[in-house]
């Protein structure tokens, strides 16, 4: 079991056979060492008790019922007066049955077996370290090829004959022609290695530091050569350089973590605790078993068959032994990752077996569903919706969720302010939803951040802190700019809300996890709080007013109306028809009074800034007044000038949407400038 005070993290990696043996073996009081599972049986069909040395053996994994052995005898657990702490007849200790949740066993494999995760998963770690093609290694593991194993200090057949100096070669049709059956078996056992044992020998001979040095030298040589002019050769060199970098990183990782490469070849196969692969009796007396039990049984059956072939019958043909070794390798592959080599193994009902990989990976796997996704106190969950009026560091919490999360704080506030005499009265006031409850809840929430999390939490921005505010409804309101960090959108996504309780957690939430303090991606440094999806659509709608100016062309398809007979107004009429505003506040006020639409063109008086006028642009029309003043009308602006050609006013042709967008950007820039001035 994992002690939460001693172990702050959980890491999955390779372990040595000695470590597996230390985990799985135990010494019972009579001095006997148990832990090896040798029989493929589970429960006896008559007594319904676990078989000895089987997959549910009580000697190996502990008693099914606390303090009761396989014989039915009972002892008080932890009673020092009891002389015997185990049953001498069946060998079962009188201990707590919870040991069956973490006590492991092991299967001693007759032949080494390659761990399929490190062979078949991409990138293949074994292929990277050995610098061999994956297909050749697969042929070697599954006994399709062989590996020449010369013995030092002795002249061998493979050394004397130059035609057999290849490291990996097919011998099925060449070497047997020179030997009798018995002579070839002796020669093969001495000279040829195949299966996972051949891979293990090569991995054991590796020096990781020499691999790093040689890979670095080759990488530098490839970098000095430069482009060859042949595109295919250049791509080949780039792929080789990338491979060398991955190989060096892998070797450094093995050195840093004190892992030996040969540990990727299994000699001892761990057996999971029985409670993690249970057999359950349902209605009608039928039994339901975990698929892993059937896969373990298959491994034990084939391993015992191989043991019998090697021990009981010395005249067994080598081909039969190699075939059985291949079956053991395939059985272990199916146990670890069913279907990784092609068609998955199925049961009698054509249902695919769930292997160990299927149990732990995915949304319904052991980690995400049981360990990461389990329910905790002071947490809630709801659908997220957009809250465009919220600040970047705020989120909207529904009243129903907020009162449950902060109920203890509200109770304390009611009692401190003498509004409730005890906890029971305070809870009754909360159930009745009195107005004073919401006032105290508002006070509590002002100084207490909350954490929002969206699964899967793939990086640190998957959980951020926010300042909560009360909102109506039953959904969590979120600012759309923070969605990219969560990889969320508003099509029904759900998020979990957590309340940090300790002062350390609250300080971390305020200083490190607030959303407005995580504007850059921690991986590449690019801005992560950028408009996406709904915000881009909103900005498009906001600024999608007419950009064609005041000129109308009956042959321009953009100007065509739904009715072909509708009259296209003249330039003068459009100019006089569109309203004029002195400032943006008047224009927005007219929009709120529904006198104009969001995309209706209008004329807005602008500051006397000549930069908006193109130097070569000429007016479309010029209108003169009786006093000598005149209006120069352009496509997107007009200028009011005096008789002396002095500029009185400049009006730009825009829409309410453009005005709103400009004001938001202006306020953001001013706020940023003020913040920078405060910092300096």
Curated annotation (Swiss-Prot):
Disulfide bonds: none annotated. This is DNA-directed RNA polymerase subunit beta'. Mg(2+) binds at residues 489, 491, 493. It is an enzyme of class 2 (transferase). Coiled coil: none annotated. DNA-dependent RNA polymerase catalyzes the transcription of DNA into RNA using the four ribonucleoside triphosphates as substrates. It is found in: Plastid, Chloroplast. One of its GO terms (cellular component) is chloroplast. It comes from Arabis hirsuta (Hairy rock-cress). In plastids the minimal PEP RNA polymerase catalytic core is composed of four subunits: alpha, beta, beta', and beta''. When a (nuclear-encoded) sigma factor is associated with the core the holoenzyme is formed, which can initiate transcription. Keywords: Chloroplast, DNA-directed RNA polymerase, Magnesium, Metal-binding, Nucleotidyltransferase, Plastid, Transcription, Transferase, Zinc. It comes from the Eukaryota. Gene3D superfamilies: 1.10.40.90, 2.40.40.20, RNA polymerase II, clamp domain, RNA polymerase Rpb1, domain 3. SMART domains: RPOLA_N. HAMAP family: RNApol_bact_RpoC1. Belongs to the RNA polymerase beta' chain family. RpoC1 subfamily. Binds 1 Mg(2+) ion per subunit. Binds 1 Zn(2+) ion per subunit. Pfam families: RNA_pol_Rpb1_1 (PF04997), RNA_pol_Rpb1_2 (PF00623). Its EC number is 2.7.7.6. Zn(2+) binds at residues 69, 71, 87, 90. Its cofactor is Mg(2+); Zn(2+). It catalyses: RNA(n) + a ribonucleoside 5'-triphosphate = RNA(n+1) + diphosphate. GO terms for biological process: DNA-templated transcription. One of its GO terms (molecular function) is DNA binding.
């Amino acid at each position: 079991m994992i002690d939460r005070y001693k172990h702050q993290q959980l890491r999955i990696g390779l372990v040595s056979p000695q470590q597996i043996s230390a985990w799985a073996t135990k010494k019972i009081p009579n001095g006997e060492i148990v832990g090896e599972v040798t029989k493929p049986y589970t429960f006896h069909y008559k007594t319904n008790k676990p078989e000895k040395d089987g997959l549910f053996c009580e000697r190996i994994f502990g008693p099914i019922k606390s303090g009761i052995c396989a014989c039915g005898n009972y002892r008080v657990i932890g009673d020092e007066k009891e002389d015997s702490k185990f049953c001498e007849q069946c060998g079962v200790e009188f201990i707590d049955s919870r040991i069956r949740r973490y006590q492991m066993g092991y299967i001693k494999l007759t032949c080494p077996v390659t761990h399929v995760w490190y062979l078949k998963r991409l990138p293949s770690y074994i292929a990277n370290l050995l610098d061999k093609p994956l297909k050749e290694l697969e042929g070697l593991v599954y006994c399709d090829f062989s590996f020449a194993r010369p013995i030092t200090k002795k002249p061998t057949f493979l050394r004397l004959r130059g035609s057999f100096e290849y490291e990996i070669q097919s011998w099925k049709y060449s070497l047997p022609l020179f030997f009798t059956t018995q002579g070839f078996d002796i020669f093969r056992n001495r000279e040829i290695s195949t299966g996972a044992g051949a891979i293990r020998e090569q991995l054991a001979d590796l020096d990781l530091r020499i691999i790093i040095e040689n890979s670095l030298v080759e990488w530098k040589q490839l970098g000095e050569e430069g482009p060859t002019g042949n595109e295919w050769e250049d791509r080949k060199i780039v792929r080789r350089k990338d491979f060398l970098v991955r190989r060096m990183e892998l070797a450094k990782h093995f050195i840093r973590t004190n892992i030996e490469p040969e540990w990727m070849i299994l000699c001892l196969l761990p057996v999971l605790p029985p409670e993690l692969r249970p057999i359950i009796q349902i209605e009608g007396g039928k039994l339901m078993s975990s698929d892993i039990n059937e896969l373990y049984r298959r491994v034990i059956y084939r391993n015992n068959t191989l043991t019998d072939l090697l021990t009981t019958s010395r005249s067994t043909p080598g081909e039969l032994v190699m075939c059985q070794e291949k079956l053991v390798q395939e059985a272990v592959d199916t146990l670890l990752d069913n279907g990784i080599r092609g068609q998955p193994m199925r049961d009698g009902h054509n249902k695919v077996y769930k292997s160990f990989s299927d149990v732990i990976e995915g949304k319904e796997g052991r980690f995400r569903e049981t360990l990461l996704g389990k329910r905790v106190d002071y947490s809630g969950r709801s659908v997220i919706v957009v809250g465009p009026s919220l600040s970047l560091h705020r989120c909207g919490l529904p009243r129903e969720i907020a009162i449950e999360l902060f109920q203890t704080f509200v109770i304390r506030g009611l009692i401190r302010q003498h509004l409730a005499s005890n906890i029971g009265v305070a809870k009754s006031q909360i159930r009745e939803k009195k107005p004073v409850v919401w006032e105290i809840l508002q006070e509590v929430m002002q100084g207490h951040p909350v954490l929002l999390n969206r699964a899967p939490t793939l990086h640190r921005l998957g959980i951020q802190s926010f300042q909560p505010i009360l909102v109506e409804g039953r959904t969590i309101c979120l600012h759309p700019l923070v969605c990219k960090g969560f990889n969320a959108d508003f099509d029904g996504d759900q998020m979990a809300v957590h309340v940090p309780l300790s002062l350390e957690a609250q300080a971390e939430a305020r200083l490190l996890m607030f959303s407005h303090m995580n504007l850059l991606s921690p991986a590449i440094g690019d801005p992560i709080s950028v408009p996406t999806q709904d915000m881009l659509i909103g900005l498009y709608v906001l600024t999608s007013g007419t950009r064609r100016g005041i000129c109308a062309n009956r042959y321009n398809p953009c100007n065509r109306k739904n009715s072909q007979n509708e009259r296209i107004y003249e330039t003068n009429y459009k100019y006089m028809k569109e309203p004029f505003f002195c400032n943006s506040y008047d224009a927005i006020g007219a929009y709120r009074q529904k006198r104009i639409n969001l995309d209706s063109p209008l004329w807005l008086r602008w500051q006397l800034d000549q930069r908006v006028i193109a130097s070569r642009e000429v007016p479309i029309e010029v209108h003169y007044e009786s006093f000598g003043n005149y209006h120069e009308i352009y496509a997107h602006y007009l200028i009011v000038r005096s008789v002396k050609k002095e500029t009185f006013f400049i009006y730009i042709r825009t829409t309410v949407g453009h005005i709103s967008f400009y004001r938001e950007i202006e306020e953001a820039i001013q706020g940023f400038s003020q913040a920078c001035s405060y910092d300096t």
